[in-house]
């Protein structure tokens, strides 16, 4: 190995010893595997961010996080590809960064596993109440994710005629009506009796959905089915349990496959935030 390396070096006599110097331009530093991986991640994150922004409808600006991730991955790739820079960094700092990265990955994996564990949640028949969590209501009707929730709720309500339904959701600045009003009209037009539909039109978050809806039922006695999209069921159930719902079951509706990575990442941060402030 040393003999092969010497072929690329220039001998220089000094103090009766031969010192080998690198020829300029003859050898280039190889990119590390880590640098290549982070560069690929940066490109994928940027492409996904642009795809959501240009071609998909989105209800929040959370997709911009993918752009931020692209920048972070790009910077990490740049640092890893500079061997001299890496050598100058303190060993303790590099060890701490690696440990934090591994712990972060483990935390992310555990939380995402919990989210996935409720992807196929089903509910037993005969519930007293159903709560449908609101989502964006557009000028031409429910958004994709909300329509999936309403259709899943409709299936259950048709099979369980004694179950009442609470449609929960306020009105955003870009919504023509409150989410509750829109859902009320959607379900009534689909054949659900109006007297079975209760409106809660003040909430602006999942926590408020459940808190405000609790005044319309007895959360200590009533059996309640919570309808939301698959990626959202785990957090919804845990928030309800923490709030005192004694008999709560999630009912998972499908979600938009192309938006699933974005929704899963958003749920991760949502769970971490709710856990941090004591709501979970």
Regions found by a protein language model. Give the residues of each.
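Cytosolic-side transmembrane helix boundary signature
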Residues: 68-100
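A structural signal for short, hydrophobic/glycine-enriched beta-strand patches
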Residues: 110-264
């Amino acid at each position: 190995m040393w003999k092969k390396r010497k072929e690329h070096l220039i001998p220089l006599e000094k103090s009766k010893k031969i010192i080998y110097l690198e020829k300029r331009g003859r050898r280039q530093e190889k990119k590390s595997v880590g640098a290549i991986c982070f560069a690929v991640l940066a490109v994928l994150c940027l492409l996904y961010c642009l795809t959501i922004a240009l071609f998909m409808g989105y209800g929040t600006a959370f997709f911009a996080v993918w752009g931020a991730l692209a920048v972070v991955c790009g910077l990490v790739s740049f640092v890893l590809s500079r061997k001299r820079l890496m050598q100058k960094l303190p060993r303790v700092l590099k060890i701490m960064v690696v440990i934090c990265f591994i712990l972060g990955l483990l935390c992310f994996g555990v939380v995402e596993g919990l989210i996935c564990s409720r992807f196929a949640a089903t509910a037993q028949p005969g519930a007293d109440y159903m709560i449908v969590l609101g989502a964006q209501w557009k000028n031409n009707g429910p958004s994709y994710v909300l329509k999936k929730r309403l259709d899943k709720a409709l299936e259950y309500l048709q099979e369980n005629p004694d179950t009442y339904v609470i449609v929960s959701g306020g009105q955003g600045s870009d919504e023509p009506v409150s989410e509750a009003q829109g859902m009320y009209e959607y379900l009534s037009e689909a054949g659900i009796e109006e007297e079975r539909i209760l409106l809660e039109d003040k909430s602006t978050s999942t926590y408020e959905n459940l808190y405000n809806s609790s005044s319309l039922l007895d959360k200590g006695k009533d059996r309640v089915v919570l309808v939301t999209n698959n990626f959202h069921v785990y957090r919804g159930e845990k928030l309800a349990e923490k709030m005192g719902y004694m008999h709560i079951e999630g009912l998972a509706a499908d979600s938009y496959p192309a938006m699933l990575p974005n929704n899963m990442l958003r749920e991760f941060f949502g769970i971490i935030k709710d856990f941090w402030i004591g709501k979970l």
